[in-house]
Amino acid sequence: MKRKLGHEPDEDIFNIFCYDLKTLDSLINMINDYDKKKLPPKRQRRYYPSKMHLLPDILSDLEELNKMTGLKKFKIQLLEQILFFIQDIDEKIMLHTVLEGPPGTGKTTVAGILSKIYAKIGIFKKVKFNVLKRSDLISEYLGGTTIKTTKALDRCKKGVVLIDEAYSIGSTSGEDIYAKECVDTINQYLTENYDKIVCIIAGYKQELDRCFFSINPGLRRRFPWTFTIDNYSSNELAEIFYKIVKEKEWETTCKESDIIDIINKKHNLFTGNGGDITSIVEKSMINNCRKNFGKEQKYTIELDDFIHAMNIFEDNKKGKLNNVPYGMYN
């Protein structure tokens, strides 16, 4: 509940014109001020966006997203989407979204945060988020895919559904009749239920175009929003390294400059992005435990542990590692 306007200094009164909303940071700052400062009289607020009052509800979700490493382009694209919808310009525009990006860049996490934002800005009454994959949609019997896909989407109604790695549904040849049946069903379902479900498709841009959208030419029109998630830079991968070490309640003596330098020299190998860093941290931990077997000096990753893990990672990527017990480094 906002306090009534009295004789307060101008800096204590919210002024919507003071904010240059070009980044997610700027939007978060504005929402914080809107939530905490006194509002001007109603006559001065008549041009405020009609859903302005809902912004504080998504503040924690925006802050969670903003803390994620990287995602610079995506964060700007999301800012633009939010600013559009809180102005209530056109409620008929569908929210079906494409998340284009490589593995290990947090697409599933991002989709989950999007589901909370969509619910809280009035798209749905409560947060509901489901993830579907090919096995949830494709039947082993001809004609059964329509039924299976429809039932799967019915379970996701009144919420957000993520079809992860959607390109796996189809093939480059376009001759998979089961995939055709599935994609046609998705297209029809989204058309008939445009206000009852939000569908997010995630995967590589080229593979999505070749193996998913090409199956039904009208499907792309159902997805008016396309967000791009880029590969992580060397600096961002290093940042993720330290985050994962902390999450595992370990420590490290590795200098950030050394980590960045080593990653930068092999940056082309990091096709799995954050997933690759997780693997390297775990390999580093394994090496640290081996060399400190029976000693107290554990739980601290040193530079030689990281280098050892990087060498194994590189060999794995290049297919040179042999005679290693299955699953040891996967």
Please annotate each region the language model reported:
Residues G112, Y167-G174, V183-A238, E247:
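Canonical AAA+ ATPase core
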Residues K126-C156:
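Short glycine-rich substrate-engagement loop in P-loop NTPases that contacts/grips substrate
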Residues I121-K126, E207, C211-S214, R220, ...:
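Conserved C-terminal "switch" segment of AAA+ ATPases
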